[in-house]
Curated annotation (Swiss-Prot):
GO BP annotations listed: pyridoxine biosynthetic process
Places the protein is found: Cytoplasm
Protein name: Pyridoxine 5'-phosphate synthase
Lineage: Bacteria, Pseudomonadati, Campylobacterota, Epsilonproteobacteria, Campylobacterales
Gene behind this protein: pdxJ
Organism the protein comes from: Helicobacter pylori (strain P12)
Gene3D superfamilies noted in UniProt: Aldolase class I
EC nos: 2.6.99.2
Catalytic activity: 3-amino-2-oxopropyl phosphate + 1-deoxy-D-xylulose 5-phosphate = pyridoxine 5'-phosphate + phosphate + 2 H2O + H(+)
Pfam families reported in the protein's UniProt record: PdxJ (PF03740)
Subunit structure: Homooctamer; tetramer of dimers.
Record: active site: 43, 70, 215
MF annotations from Gene Ontology: pyridoxine 5'-phosphate synthase activity
Top EC class for this record: transferase
Pathway the protein takes part in: Cofactor biosynthesis; pyridoxine 5'-phosphate biosynthesis; pyridoxine 5'-phosphate from D-erythrose 4-phosphate: step 5/5
HAMAP family: PdxJ (MF_00279)
Length: 262
């Protein structure tokens, strides 16, 4: 299983104060020196709430690890990434809403302009991945447009797992739709969410598409996904950075790597 470390929220700390620290390149090399991280993931959002264009340029210039850039189909961002001298190892196209706290679901593959953006990256020799819900129609779209990799949105699975097996439902930011569900209901929905991820990962494998997954994964809910043999990569960020605030980035990375690289 490949471990993709999302370092967006290292930069969130910097941008909150509009200062120079924490240094994104220091985070990069801490990750590299653990010898446990396979790639670095960043999300270049339209609103630039964390990662900036300059961060992209600096990372691509010196990173010893592959860089996966998440982004929307925004024309300005597409043009910027297609113009880069140093190319990312892949671009993962994600849905984006300026009012969202974080990505809320998978990509709508009927989105106007999506096909043109995929073609633009392919024409520049940049691998494309699509951040999708685990649905067969989305996989068929990927195959039809020569997309060799997808990342399944694991938010539904992760939220259900957290509601059932942690104290998430008692916290200030508890998800209201899950608070009133019984443990039996949560278990059934969690089981179904896991089965759907497993089915679609297997479907992707038979289509010749590499299946990755990410969103909301943490030190508790990630373990079950290791039972899906056709999943090849997990992208995890917020949970690792949250733990890093308390124990340090190196230790937080190593603890996660110990879980997913058995």
């Amino acid at each position: 299983m490949r471990f993709g470390l999302n370092i967006d929220h290292i930069v969130t700390l910097r941008e909150i104060r509009k200062t120079y620290e924490p240094e994104i390149l220091e985070a990069l090399f801490i990750a590299k020196n653990t010898h446990k991280v396979d790639l670095i993931t960043i999300h270049l959002r339209e609103d630039k709430r964390h990662i900036q264009n300059e961060d992209v340029l600096r990372l691509l210039e010196i990173s010893p690890l592959p860089i996966n850039i998440e982004c929307s189909i925004n024309a300005t961002i597409t043009d910027f990434l297609c113009s880069l001298k140093n190319k990312p190892s892949k671009v993962t196209i994600v849905p984006e809403n300026r009012n969202e706290v974080t990505t809320e679901g998978g990509l709508d593959c009927s989105l106007k302009g999506l096909e043109e953006v995929i073609r633009a990256y392919h024409n520049k020799g940049i691998e494309v991945s699509l951040f999708i819900d685990p649905l067969k129609d989305s996989l068929h779209f990927a195959r039809e447009h020569q997309v060799k990799q997808v990342e399944f949105h694991t938010g539904v699975y992760a939220n259900l797992h957290n509601a059932l097996y942690s104290n998430a439902n008692n916290q200030i930011h508890a998800i209201s739709a899950l608070k009133d569900k019984s443990p039996k209901e949560l278990k059934e929905e969690l089981h179904n969410a896991f089965l759907q991820l497993r089915r679609m990962s297997k479907e992707a494998f038979f289509m010749g598409i590499t299946a990755c997954a990410g969103h909301g994964l943490n030190y508790t809910n990630v373990k079950e996904l290791l039972k899906i043999p056709s999943l090849r990569e997990l992208n995890i960020g917020h949970s690792v950075v949250s733990k890093a605030v308390l124990v340090g980035l190196e230790k937080a990375i190593l603890e996660m790597a110990q879980l997913i690289k058995r």
